[in-house]
């Protein structure tokens, strides 16, 4: 099969290699080479996320920026587009052109697999930033969704005194079943000052200026939530608090693993259509 991979990060570079190794023909654009709008292929693979600002294609490795309009021009002749977090209007536009559109985020297995490098990347950041070992330290994990569950379990295995903040009674029961301490949101203020590191996974403003004013001087806050995150970054900067907004960790810490995950999903999509 003939693929054209446009934009994206190191994951898409590695994905190109995997596709070639599996006998496919692959062209790439906006992955370090010169922009070439004449390239065409029936199967187009875009980045994940598709765009970060709604104007430009997410293409951090491109030699020159690629506008979303340029992407739509390139893909006029294609049969299928596969990418992640495609804006609703763009998806509708492609479908009106008769193009089959598949979004990675519609495939739960990708979301689950990506939690592993996200958790490992967050732990790596903590290890490189904290002035103490994670072993024996106190960590707060805010949120007990997919990422929160995997992260909390990995921290526990590193002998970190891990506390999970969650809302649902069922999540508190799961924490207890997994040997984890947990608190409710109303208990955050009385516990936050005990923490050496705080990991936020909740896409909500949970760490406002009042909460941040309570943390220890050397505490590190690692925000894993999608933009705009869950912290008052302006206050944190003003107060000298170390807050790291760690986005797109899978592609940064484990691009080969992530590329293999994407390949499995792409192969599944194409097999379904054949």
Predicted regions and their residues:
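NAD(P)-binding Rossmann-fold cofactor-contacting core
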Residues: 22-35, 158-178
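N-terminal glycine-/charge-rich "phosphate-binding" loop or analogous flexible N-terminal tail
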Residues: 3-39
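Rossmann-like adenosine-cofactor binding region
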Residues: 49, 66-75, 175-250
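Residues in the short beta-alpha loop(s) of Rossmann-like NAD(P)-binding domains
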Residues: 9, 32, 87, 167-169, ...
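Phosphate-coordination loops involved in phosphoryl transfer and adenosine-cofactor binding
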Residues: 1-2, 78, 135-138, 218
């Amino acid at each position: 099969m003939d693929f054209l991979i446009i934009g994206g990060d190191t994951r898409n570079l590695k994905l190109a290699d995997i596709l070639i190794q599996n006998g496919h023909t692959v062209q790439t654009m906006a992955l370090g080479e010169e922009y070439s709008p004449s390239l065409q292929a029936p199967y187009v693979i875009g980045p994940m996320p598709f765009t970060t600002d709604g104007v430009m294609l997410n293409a951090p490795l491109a030699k020159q920026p690629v506008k979303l309009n340029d992407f739509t021009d390139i893909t006029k002749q294609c049969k299928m587009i596969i990418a992640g977090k495609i804006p609703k209007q763009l998806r509708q536009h492609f479908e009106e052109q008769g193009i089959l559109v598949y979004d990675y985020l519609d495939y739960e297995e990708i979301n689950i697999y990506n939690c592993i490098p996200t958790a490992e990347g967050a732990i790596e950041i903590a290890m490189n930033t904290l002035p103490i070992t994670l072993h024996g330290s106190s960590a707060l994990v805010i949120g007990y969704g997919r990422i929160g569950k995997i992260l909390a379990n990995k921290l526990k295995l590193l002998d970190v005194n891990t506390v999970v903040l969650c809302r649902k009674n069922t999540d508190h029961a799961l924490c207890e079943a997994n040997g984890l301490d947990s608190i409710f949101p109303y208990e955050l203020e009385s516990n936050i000052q005990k923490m050496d590191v705080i990991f936020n996974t909740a896409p909500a403003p949970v760490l406002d200026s009042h909460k941040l004013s309570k943390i220890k001087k050397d505490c590190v806050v690692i925000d894993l939530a999608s933009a705009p995150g869950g912290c008052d970054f302006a206050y944190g900067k003003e107060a000298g608090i170390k807050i790291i907004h760690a986005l797109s960790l899978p592609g940064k810490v484990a691009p080969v693993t992530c590329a293999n995950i994407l390949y499995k999903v792409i192969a599944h999509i194409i097999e379904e259509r054949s």
